[in-house]
Amino acid sequence: MAVTTDQKSQVMRDYQRAAGDTGSPEVQVALLTTRINSLVDHFKQHVKDHHSRRGLLRMVSRRRKLLDYLKSKNNDSYRALIERLGLRK
């Protein structure tokens, strides 16, 4: 199931740096993580959906690049974000 507008708005409110912030790396990574988690659930039921799997891999790659950027600019924010999203073990 796709991520709804309400879910996106909630994620933006939770991860924004200041009111109205929708473009910071933290918000973008959080939104991508929400979409990735939604697709992972989709693939549990639709194993042979290879076309969507390509989109998933593209999103994972984009999230990785944003995380690398955030790590190079603000390591403390990077560590807080991955802890909050539960991305690293």
Swiss-Prot record:
GO terms for cellular component: cytosolic small ribosomal subunit. Residues 1-22 are annotated as: Disordered. Transmembrane segments: none annotated. The keyword Metal-binding does not apply. Keywords: Ribonucleoprotein, Ribosomal protein, RNA-binding, rRNA-binding. Residues 1-10 have a biased composition (Polar residues). One of its GO terms (molecular function) is rRNA binding. InterPro entries: Ribosomal_uS15 (IPR000589), Ribosomal_uS15_bac-type (IPR005290), uS15_NS1_RNA-bd_sf (IPR009068). SMART domains: Ribosomal_S15 (SM01387). One of its GO terms (biological process) is translation. PROSITE patterns: RIBOSOMAL_S15 (PS00362). It holds the Pfam family Ribosomal_S15. It comes from the Bacteria. PANTHER family: RIBOSOMAL PROTEIN S15, BACTERIAL AND ORGANELLAR, SMALL RIBOSOMAL SUBUNIT PROTEIN US15M. One of the primary rRNA binding proteins, it binds directly to 16S rRNA where it helps nucleate assembly of the platform of the 30S subunit by binding and bridging several RNA helices of the 16S rRNA. NCBIfam families: S15_bact (TIGR00952). Part of the 30S ribosomal subunit. Forms a bridge to the 50S subunit in the 70S ribosome, contacting the 23S rRNA. Belongs to the universal ribosomal protein uS15 family. This is Small ribosomal subunit protein uS15. It comes from Nitrosomonas europaea (strain ATCC 19718 / CIP 103999 / KCTC 2705 / NBRC 14298).
